[in-house]
Amino acid sequence: MYIEMIDETKQVSQEMMEQTIDLLNFAAKTIGKEDKEMAVTFVTNDRSHALNLEYRDTDRPTDVISLEYKPELPIAFSQEDLELDPDLAGMLQEFDAYIGELFISVDKAHEQAEAYGHSFEREMGFLAVHGFLHINGYDHYTPEEEKEMFTLQEEILTAYGLTRQ
């Protein structure tokens, strides 16, 4: 899976970025999404607050914002169009591959790691997997959805080696 990494905070180590990429690739393999593309941006609480207000109409910072890419209308071209412009077929594959982006608040990750008594690495991993599952259609609005999503995210984190301890 191709993952574009952006650190707006300038606080995320190269090792943490590599762990995030590795973990998301592991999660993608687990749910059969290895051929997809996404972006992860590490942000401050101020930026998280602004994004949360803009996209969720919630006036406070949050730990992770998941923006699933769902084109409203399918992009369709005729066979003739595709034959006349070979780059068009490649471009369509790229659109189909892009699943969305995550904005992870580094500030919130530090706060929550301390509050929950586990490592910053575990919290960053949790937020990445949680957001990744959201952009792949998982949610936790109902008890059934919550059980499915939370069980899967814990299985991924444990299998990867990021336990709560």
Swiss-Prot record:
The keyword Plastid does not apply. It is found in: Cytoplasm. It comes from the Bacteria. One of its GO terms (cellular component) is cytoplasm. Its EC number is 3.1.-.-. Keywords: Cytoplasm, Endonuclease, Hydrolase, Metal-binding, Nuclease, Ribosome biogenesis, rRNA processing, Zinc. One of its GO terms (molecular function) is metalloendopeptidase activity. InterPro entries: MetalPrtase_cat_dom_sf_prd, YbeY, YbeY_CS. Signal peptide: none annotated. It is an enzyme of class 3 (hydrolase). The keyword Cytoplasm applies. Single strand-specific metallo-endoribonuclease involved in late-stage 70S ribosome quality control and in maturation of the 3' terminus of the 16S rRNA. Belongs to the endoribonuclease YbeY family. This is Endoribonuclease YbeY. It comes from Streptococcus equi subsp. zooepidemicus (strain MGCS10565).
